[in-house]
Amino acid sequence: MIWIVGGTSDTRSLLDKLSEKINLNNVIVSVTTEYGEKLLNDYNIKVIQKVLDKNKILDFIDKTNLNTIIDTSHPYAENISKNILEVIKSKNIKYFRYEREVTETIFDERFESLKD
């Protein structure tokens, strides 16, 4: 079983790629918002919509026959990634971080107010 920690458009990109290779019946995706869950309605997968703290992560892992975690959570959502890594230290579960390349934003002009 594969657990995808969702939360970005990368989640859907990954699901599209995975669906070409494996049966998505063996995939569970977790998201924290109803909107995130709604975005996954087109996929034939189990979606869990809730905030997972360490205890909930441990409980989820213990109740699920996981062998792989793919973390596609938002880069600023550091707690979920950190908590997962702490929980799986003593487990035989593979962990992968799936993250798009960060692009640098350059501003040409700055404004003091909207009137400018």
Where are these regions (language model features)?
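Small/polar loops that bind or transfer phosphate-bearing groups
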Residues: 6, 49, 72-73
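General N-terminal targeting signals
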Residues: 19-21, 44, 64-65, 86
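N-terminal glycine-rich anion-binding loop in soluble enzyme alpha/beta folds
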Residues: 6-43
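Glycine/small-residue-rich loop that forms an oxyanion/phosphate-binding "nest" at active or ligand-binding sites
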Residues: 58-116
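Extreme N-terminal starter segment of soluble prokaryotic enzymes
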Residues: 1-3
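Short acidic active-site motifs
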Residues: 53-57
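N-terminal beta-loop-helix "entrance" segment that forms/cooperates
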Residues: 29-51, 106-116
